[in-house]
Swiss-Prot record:
Localization per record: Cell membrane
Protein name per the record: Probable receptor-like protein kinase At5g59700
Gene3D superfamilies: Galactose-binding lectin, Phosphorylase Kinase, domain 1, Transferase(Phosphotransferase) domain 1
GO molecular function list: ATP binding; protein serine/threonine kinase activity; transmembrane receptor protein tyrosine kinase activity
Residues forming the catalytic site: 606 (proton acceptor)
Glycosylated residues, chain numbering: 40, 216, 279, 380
Cross-referenced InterPro entries: ANXUR1/2-like (IPR045272), Kinase-like_dom_sf (IPR011009), Malectin-like_Carb-bd_dom (IPR024788), Prot_kinase_dom (IPR000719), Protein_kinase_ATP_BS (IPR017441), Ser-Thr/Tyr_kinase_cat_dom (IPR001245), Ser/Thr_kinase_AS (IPR008271)
Membrane topology: Single-pass type I membrane protein
Extracellular side: 25-406
Residues engaged in binding ATP: 488-496, 510
Transmembrane spans: 407-427
UniProt topological domain (Cytoplasmic) ranges: 428-829
EC number: 2.7.11.-
């Protein structure tokens, strides 16, 4: 009986293969299961077999089949299988890519209310869903590259909850569908290793056309219309010429996208006003913290001849392709189907991907642009996750794997023991050398300063001095056990509390949130950086605590909070223009000090108004060094590193090239300058499209010479024109597209001092002289590190904790303005 049942199953599974023959692609594996059902169901010519026939694929501690949702318009959503314990599906498959489609439609069955179900789904290599809940019908589609002869899917209920599934698809994917190395969106280079990435389909969109159902797609995909994603629907028109589509050999095929997608498009509606200059934009909400694979589908169905369509393609306002001529890609074929692949990491910093098309600025005879289709797929992170949550897979429980592991362990156990013993010996010798050499290697610390700890986070011996360590009991006493009434802020690292130490010192206590994406690396960097610095314009670190796996940083308390809170959103009194200039000058001094250290320069990497704090006298201090990076070696121009920072302040060149320099801080500081001037957020999605990004908005008015039109209303009529002009010119230079064109922080500092002097009094000579740009400054003032040492003493060595030098500037508090007044007046020399 069992043989007959299995033979029938094979026959059933062969039916879809016969159907696919008429489309050209025959999947090697094609498992379609109607979970919870005792009968087969045909959906759009595909047969989903009953749960009874699929029982050979499932290992589950309980057999609960639910069937009560008779209101569903699709048979596969009328039943479900409920898992009350860890359950596994195991399929024999050919190696290669496979679609995994999980169908969910919650309903109530007996005591099981499926909307309250919470569970995780994982393969042997990737986490697909973590702590997943579902309130309405949804289909989750994944593409996994299977490297073995089987695929295992595990359903794990969270806590006392349960899991459920309405239908399951495991179907082969053509090997050529995801191949090659896609380009990075907006930056040079290519992403290598796409073939082994796990992908989750987030959006699959048919631009300008209707919804495409599985019956009209050779790979049974669903394509949604683009209308709900368009930002301005009145700027476009839909075009449909399905019969014109030409699949050119060697390029896109019907497996890439169906004819219905390539035969329709969304086109710029520029016919009424061909001279108008606008972009067509689509916005897509995504999960932050991941890279995304983007596939653009193009087919020129709007031109009457070759070389009549040139346009630009943008992703998150970055140029991806300029002057795109589709016919040049397709061997001079009109209406040829073509796909372009990119990888973007911009979603790591935001919850949205913005895609735009716009007319070419070079080929203006044909002012239009098109897009036929778009696919957006989430890529697994470094932890092989496609969903971030608390779930951690325990690994395969296969008996075979355990046996193999045991055999290997017994075989090489003695060898490993020798290696471990040898390793201990090497570490012991190295530790002795490091201690003799006063190394900064990070090692565990105990509360008494020794190098062993059972409960401490792995940290470093900070400059061989444990005086920075503060006991947890002292921190709790200072904050009244982290009383929420003492909370004064919250950030990416965790909450900040106001506290007071035994000696009466007021402190700000930053306590890490265990769920924060910032962790040990940022904690370590903050301590390492701030323990080296002593400067009046950098926030001082008082100590840290790492007991009981806590990560706590204790700083000097800044009475007036963040610069951001004094600009907008808090209802505080408005700052005067002089106060704002002095705050900018103080911040610039702090950054200049970081960039021009005695050893390697330090790049802050997260300059923003929220990281500039103000003391009781409104003196500015730069804070938050968790993302800071030591600058390049003397013979190098940059540091290659993963992009980190805050959206809106991020240097676009750093984002494109992933090459960090001091000029990245200069760009961010330029954004802060315009934020100070305009008193508005750097990104404000509530405003019109052209005003959303402050840097772009301010640069537009600065280049017009009309910056006064967008300044903080409370400052109108209170800023001298020449002071505003110098401030605007300086900010404009900071926001140059390329770092080489930006000034150093020393140049910025000099010009800000100049702007302050222009505000306070008219300098000798013609005030129009103040219009000179940064690049036109006398050579003497272009770089504080190379000028006349008799002039530069208060800047070039500003603030390093050196007894002889600190008396000159840092400790004495000599105003830069006094020195500056000698620089700009001829009689001062």
């Amino acid at each position: 009986m069992g043989g007959e049942k299995f033979g029938f199953l094979i026959w059933i599974l062969s039916i879809p293969c016969l159907i696919f023959l008429c489309y050209g692609y025959v999947p090697v594996d094609n498992y379609l299961i109607n979970c919870g059902s005792s009968t087969n169901v045909t959906v759009t010519s595909r047969v989903f077999i009953s749960d009874n026939l699929a029982s050979n694929f499932l290992t589950s501690p309980n057999e609960i089949l639910a069937a009560s949702n008779r209101n569903s318009n699709s048979d596969i959503y009328q039943t479900a299988r409920i898992f009350t314990g860890i359950s596994k599906y195991r399929f024999s498959v050919a190696r290669g890519r496979h679609w995994i489609r999980l169908h969910f439609n919650p309903f109530q069955y007996q005591n099981f209310q499926m909307v309250s179900a919470k569970f995780s789904v994982s393969s042997e290599t990737h986490v697909l869903l973590s702590d997943f809940t579902v309130s309405s019908r949804v289909m989750k589609e994944y593409s996994l590259n299977v490297a073995t002869d089987h695929l295992e899917l595990t359903f794990t209920p969270s806590g006392d909850s349960f899991a459920f599934l309405n239908a399951l698809e495991v179907v082969s994917v053509p090997d050529t569908l995801f191949s090659g190395d896609p380009s990075f969106a907006g930056s040079p280079g290519k992403f290598q290793g796409l073939s082994w990435q796990a992908l989750e389909t987030v959006y699959r969109v048919n631009m300008g056309g209707p919804r495409v159902t599985p019956s009209n797609d050779t790979l049974s995909r669903i394509w949604e219309p683009d209308s709900e994603f368009l930002v301005e629907k009145n700027l476009v028109k839909s075009v449909s010429k399905i019969a014109s589509v030409d699949y050119v050999p060697g390029f896109a095929t019907e497996e890439t996208a169906p004819r219905t997608v390539y035969g329709t498009c969304t086109e710029m509606n520029s016919a009424d006003n061909p001279s108008s200059n606008f972009n067509v934009t689509w916005d897509f909400d995504v999960d932050p913290g991941f890279q995304y694979f983007l596939r653009f589908h193009f087919c020129d169905i709007v031109s009457k001849a070759l070389n009549q369509l040139y346009f630009n393609l943008y992703v998150d306002s970055m140029d991806v392709v300029e002057n795109l001529d589709l016919s040049s890609y397709l061997s001079n074929t009109l209406s040829g189907a073509y796909a372009m692949d990119f990888v973007t990491g911009s979603a790591k910093l935001t919850k949205r991907i913005r895609v735009s098309i716009g007319r070419s600025s070079v080929h203006t005879d044909y002012p239009t642009a098109i897009l036929n289709g778009l696919e957006i797929m989430k890529m697994n992170n470094s932890k092989s996750q496609l969903s971030i949550g608390t779930f951690l897979p325990s690994g395969s429980s296969s008996t075979t794997k355990k046996n193999v592991g045991m055999i290997i362990g017994l075989t090489i156990g003695s060898l490993l023991a020798l290696v471990v013993l040898g390793g201990f010996f090497v570490l012991y010798k190295k530790r002795g050398r490091d201690q003799d050499g006063n190394s900064k290697t990070w090692i565990p610390l105990s509360s008494n300063g020794t190098t062993s700890s059972s409960n401490g986070t792995t940290l470093a011996s900070i400059a061989s001095n444990s005086s920075y360590r503060i006991p947890l009991v002292a921190v709790k006493e200072a904050t009244n056990s982290f009383d929420e009434n003492r909370a004064i802020g919250v950030g990416g690292f965790g909450k900040v509390y106001k506290g007071e130490l035994h000696d009466g010192t007021k402190v700000a206590v930053k306590r890490a949130n265990p769920k924060s994406q910032q962790g040990l690396a940022e904690f370590r960097t903050e301590i390492e950086m701030l323990s080296q610095f002593r400067h009046r314009h950098l926030v001082s670190l008082i100590g840290y605590c790492d007991e009981n796996n806590e990560m706590i940083l204790v700083y000097e308390y800044m009475e007036n909070g963040t610069l951001k809170s004094h600009l907008y959103g808090s209802g505080l009194l408005s700052l005067s223009w002089k106060q704002r200039l002095e705050i900018c000058i103080g911040s610039a001094r702090g950054l200049h000090y970081l960039h021009t250290g005695d050893a390697k320069p330090v790049i802050h990497r997260d300059v923003k108004s929220a990281n500039i704090l103000l003391d009781e006298n409104l003196m500015a201090k730069v804070a938050d060094f968790g993302l800071s990076k030591t600058g390049p070696e003397i013979d190098q121009t940059h540091v290659s590193t993963a992009v980190k920072g805050s959206f809106g302040y991020l240097d676009p060149e750093y984002f494109r090239r992933q090459q960090l320099t001091e000029k990245s801080d200069v760009y961010s500081f330029g954004v802060v300058m315009f934020e100070v001037l305009c008193a508005r957020p750097v990104i404000d999605p509530t405003l019109t499209r052209e005003m959303v990004n402050l840097a772009e908005w301010a640069m537009k008015w600065q280049k017009k010479g009309q910056l006064e039109h967008i300044i903080d209303p409370s400052l109108r009529g209170k800023i001298r024109p020449d002071s505003l002009r110098k401030f605007g010119e300086t900010g404009e230079k900071c926001l140059a597209d390329y770092g080489v064109d930006r000034p150093s922080m020393g140049d910025v500092l000099w010009n800000l001092e100049y702007a302050l002097q222009l505000q306070e009094a008219v300098v000798d000579g013609d005030p129009e002289d103040s219009t000179n740009m940064i690049g036109e400054l006398p050579l003497r003032f272009n770089d504080y590190n190379h000028g006349d040492t008799s002039v530069n003493f208060s800047v070039a060595k500003e603030g390093r904790f050196d007894e002889e030098e600190s008396s000159v500037d840092d400790s004495s508090g000599v105003s830069m303005s006094k020195v500056f007044s000698q620089l700009i007046k001829s009689e001062g020399r």
